[in-house]
Amino acid sequence: MSGDERAIADFVQARLSQKHGWGVERIEDTLIATWPGGGSGSGRRILLCGHLDTVPGEEGYQEDEDYLYGLGACDMKGGLAVMLALADEQLMDATTLVFYPCEEVAFERNGLHRLGSREALLADHDVAVLLEPTDGAVELGCQGTLRVRLDLHGRRAHTSRPWMGVNAIDRLGTVLARVNDFDRRSPELGAVVFRESLSPVRVESFVANNVVPDKAALWLNYRFAPDLTIAQAKDRLVAWIAPELTDDDTITLEDAASAGTPNPEGFEALIRRAGSVRAKLGWTDVSFLSGLGVPSVNFGPGDPLLAHSGHERVAKSALVASLAALSSWIGIDRESRTT
């Protein structure tokens, strides 16, 4: 779980330390493993990343002939397993594997963003793959995300005489109706279609059971397409909500992360091998890597629709297929393959 990755980081470090030819560096619970590449590679510098943490939930796992079940099986222990399996191979291209903590929580705790001077190492790559679950498709870019808080004001009164006040909870209804009518765009960018969403995610209002409340708060999460900046997305949302607000109401931006640019350049062979390409619905660290100037995609085993659910699973066949696709794309020296 996020913030409790020490044991799995120790396990991954021990496994990587057994791989001949790999350099392993640890920064807190982030692991960076580097491979120099073979002499007959393409000359590319490839970066593969995966997060160690999971969302909260029930621990334990099960296995049958076809699947592995349990918290994080899909998001994203399957991807981590593929990364470790790649470390068994004699890769043709220079490759860096980064295993990092706290992706599922606040941006400032994310291990990929806490590398300090080592962040330059990430930027010194030609292409990057984030092994998030994509069900074997190559997913380009990612949505941006922002969370805003709306504070609505009314006038307090006794519930036996509600006409003497203005119920702030009643005002939530008109705002929510406006939210429901928001134009959730589906722009086509880089030959893939991004589907926007705007969701109410939290409400608060209470004084006492015999008081008409004079305050109510509503939180909204807007997942926006990569053709908008954070500022543009916020302006678009505020402009839509504003007609239902009074001068006393406020809108506060509490959290935001930029979208990731969809860029298939450098991934043509991987896309052909995967057989499917689409937009990434959701935010991933493709946004962060793209911001460093590294063309990046999402590609990994597991159905993203099962992520964060109470019935996560990953097919063993999906692990094999993802490993085969990445091995083919990077290139393997079969004659020098490690045991």
What are these regions (language model features)?
Residues 1-42:
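A non-catalytic alpha/beta surface segment that caps or lines the substrate-entry region
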Residues 12, 80-87, 115, 172-175, ...:
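Buried hydrophobic packing segments
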Residues 31-35, 66-73, 243, 248:
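Generic recognition of long tandem-repeat/solenoid scaffolds
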Residues 42-99, 107, 111:
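Active-site metal-coordination/substrate-binding segment of hydrolases
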Residues 81-147, 190:
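Acidic/histidine-rich catalytic neighborhood of metal-dependent amide-processing enzymes
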